[in-house]
Amino acid sequence: MAVGKNKRLSKGKKGLKKKTDTFAKKDWYNIKAPGTFAVRDVGKTLVNRTTGLKNANDALKGRIFEVSLADLQKDEDHAFRKVKLRVDEVQGKNCLTNFHGLDFTSDKLRSLVRKWQTLIEANVVVKTTDDYLLRLFCIAFTKRRPNQVKKTTYAQSSQIRAIRKKMVEIMARDASSCTLAQLTQKLIPEVIGREIEKATQGIYPLQNVHVRKVKLLKAPKFDLGALLGLHGESSQDDSGQKVEREFKETVLEQV
């Protein structure tokens, strides 16, 4: 008889692992947009429950969500723009967010670029009155003059430089003279783009002038009172302030 363990006799039943539902340890939280947008209730996010030293609120703070502006404004004309919202505070089951940036969809940007015209881009770093440091990117395209027969609409280098200078001046002036919330209200109806188009009419006619991207470089020290004021001091209200598309700002004649 062979010396050693009899494998067949010592073999017992396999211990089956108990299946645990991972979602049982998680909670859903509501994402609330600032009052500058028409729709306040953005969606929901999932996070692990508070256990021991791990706090659920700490895991939620700093999360960034990308939302279509069409959903926030209930207007399909804004579908090509995406807004980034950052969670700054958690109250109960509600995540209070603040504006973190803006961008265009890649398909919209590609659809704007065409033959026989000049693309002009400019960017500027500005600080709002409430100490948010932002970088704004602007894009514009030349268009035909009235009664123009020539197919191409190429601008000269001197004209491009002059247009770019106007872009930087207008973006810097408009952004540095208002708060982040007020700047958001200007960006939604594209006030800055129309202002640039009007100011550069004498240099070269432009079309499709947009602030295509807003990047948040640095935020000031967190102020809970300012955030609650932005959310109307109540996270239960699902309605915000709708920014009308017809909103127009007075343009200085000297620009």
UniProtKB/Swiss-Prot annotation:
Pfam families named among the record's database cross-references: Ribosomal_S3Ae (PF01015)
Top-rank taxon: Eukaryota
Localisation: Cytoplasm
Gene source species: Pyrenophora tritici-repentis (strain Pt-1C-BFP)
Entry GO terms, CC: cytosolic small ribosomal subunit
Claim: Magnesium is one of the keywords in the record: no
Residues making up the signal peptide according to the UniProt record: none
Gene that produces this protein: rps1
Modified residues (N-acetylalanine): A2
Protein name (Swiss-Prot/TrEMBL): Small ribosomal subunit protein eS1
Single biological process term from Gene Ontology: translation
Family to which this protein belongs: Belongs to the eukaryotic ribosomal protein eS1 family.
PANTHER family: 40S RIBOSOMAL PROTEIN S3A
Subunit annotation: Component of the small ribosomal subunit. Mature ribosomes consist of a small (40S) and a large (60S) subunit. The 40S subunit contains about 33 different proteins and 1 molecule of RNA (18S). The 60S subunit contains about 49 different proteins and 3 molecules of RNA (25S, 5.8S and 5S).
Keywords, ordered alphabetically: Acetylation, Cytoplasm, Ribonucleoprotein, Ribosomal protein
GO molecular function, one term: structural constituent of ribosome
